[in-house]
Amino acid sequence: MSFSARSRRQRLQLEEAYQREMIFKMHTLDLVREGVNKRSPAFVRAFTSAKEASLDLDRYMQAHSRVGRVEQNARALAQRVEAQAAVGEILDRHRRFLHPDFIDNFDSREDSIVEREERLGDVLSDINCDGGGGEVGDPQEWLGHEDEALLMRWMLEEAPRVSTRIAADPHSPRSTCPAPRKAPEDARCGARKPGEVNNYTPSAQPRSQETTVDHLASPDEGTRLGDRTRDLEHHSTAPMRTHPNVLASERRRLGVVHQREKSSESQESATRSKAIVGQEDQKWLGGIPPLSDEELQVDMGIPTMNGPIYPDYHRTA
């Protein structure tokens, strides 16, 4: 009988003994619940059968556990023998590593290899295989100084140019505010025919005066502002402009433009008058002495994320 057939037969015997023991035991307990006398032949027969089935189950379980334990020990020994055989085979295949002179031979061969490797490096340095100007450079740095300078020049040429129309103070928040976008020509000059609804775009809606005034104008914008003023006057007097809301918006824009022109002219006149007055015209009439220009200047410091940083001469002053 093979090992698998014998193992299957043992499992079936164990399962049969377990089922017989459960059946006779449940029958005995049912008789007890019904109140049958323990001297009754039915109870005696049921109890005796249940006891024999229980003893048979114990014997089968002990035999099965013994067989299983022996099988486990045999498998463990077989694994040890197989491992020993595998290790012996590996050692036989690499028995040259176990030779007494292997370590000395290995060290001498390693020294010879290192010496030849250094000699190869010396030959490479002598003939200069990298094609440089006399020195062997790093093979990873294939860009020279001239190449780096040329690349930097290309990067600077492709960088976006800084606009000149910014505020005088580079740290002013107005220098970072985007300029208000102009309304499209078709939206400003759009007209409706008689009997049609004026479907003007949202870009033609009136803008707030604060948005228009916040855009700082430089002195060299006088010509452009004059051209835009004439353009606005032309569009405001055109016969096609009939919508009252759009007309009021253009009038407000025209007023803001005139106000900006007047403010720029007043600033230019004040600058010219200040330039005419010299230091010799200022006289001290007594009392508190006047402050010098250096004392009147306010140093904003160097702006950082943690606040302004002042140079060392402020601390020593």
Swiss-Prot record:
Protein keywords: Host cytoplasm, Host nucleus, Virion, Virion tegument
Cellular component terms (Gene Ontology): host cell cytoplasm; host cell nucleus; viral tegument
Biased composition (Polar residues): 198-211
Residue stretches of biased makeup (Basic and acidic residues): 182-195, 217-236, 249-265
Function: Contributes to the nuclear transport of the viral transcriptional activator VP16 during the early phase of infection. Therefore, participates indirectly in the regulation of the immediate-early gene expression. Additionally, seems to be important for efficient nuclear targeting of capsids.
Family that this chain belongs to: Belongs to the alphaherpesvirinae HHV-1 UL14 protein family.
Name used for this protein in its record: Tegument protein UL14 homolog
Organism of this sequence: Equine herpesvirus 1 (strain Ab4p)
